[in-house]
Amino acid sequence: MAEINKPAFKKPDLKKMTPKGERKANRRGAARLAAVQALYQMDIGGAGINETFAEFESFWIGNEVEGEQYLPAEAAFFRDIVAGVVREQKQIDPLIDDLLARGWPLARIDAILRAVMRAGAYELEHRKDIPARVVVSEYVDVAHAFVEKDETGMVNAVLDQIARRFRAEEFSKG
């Protein structure tokens, strides 16, 4: 059995996330949460992508862990986000870095917030099938499960700027 209290796993407060019904959007929200946790684990613990996929898909997603019930997630969507961030990270990190306040490089930001912003940036740039406002809102919601409101404001500001850069047409519709 996998060890539950891995130091590289950051437990979310699922009660802070917006409750949603059992529907496709909810399964995508669960995939986003799992992707952020997986990216965090890979960043902090140095785990490889295949090992991380195997662990999350068999142990975390859709299971009860430490008294918390994790929702079933859309596995293909989870894999796309994680693999996409890993593949595009050399382009994503400078993009985020440029949008952060002077003196606050991405490397200085908490690892869980790095994971949230990387995943959101990936979706905004590469998943044009999902409305930008939905992506920003979902990742702000994921951030709420881990950090205080001040920090979610930073996530919102950075992802909103990325959305307007890559999806300007969605914001000019009124």
From Swiss-Prot:
GO terms for biological process: DNA-templated transcription termination; transcription antitermination. InterPro entries: NusB-like_sf (IPR035926), NusB_fam (IPR011605), NusB_RsmB_TIM44 (IPR006027). It comes from the Bacteria. Disulfide bonds: none annotated. One of its GO terms (molecular function) is RNA binding. Transmembrane segments: none annotated. The keyword Transcription applies. Pfam families: NusB. Keywords: RNA-binding, Transcription, Transcription antitermination, Transcription regulation. GO terms for cellular component: cytosol. PANTHER family: ANTITERMINATION NUSB DOMAIN-CONTAINING PROTEIN, N UTILIZATION SUBSTANCE PROTEIN B-RELATED. Involved in transcription antitermination. Required for transcription of ribosomal RNA (rRNA) genes. Binds specifically to the boxA antiterminator sequence of the ribosomal RNA (rrn) operons. Belongs to the NusB family. This is Transcription antitermination protein NusB. It comes from Rhodopseudomonas palustris (strain TIE-1). The lineage of its organism: Bacteria, Pseudomonadati, Pseudomonadota, Alphaproteobacteria, Hyphomicrobiales. The gene is nusB.
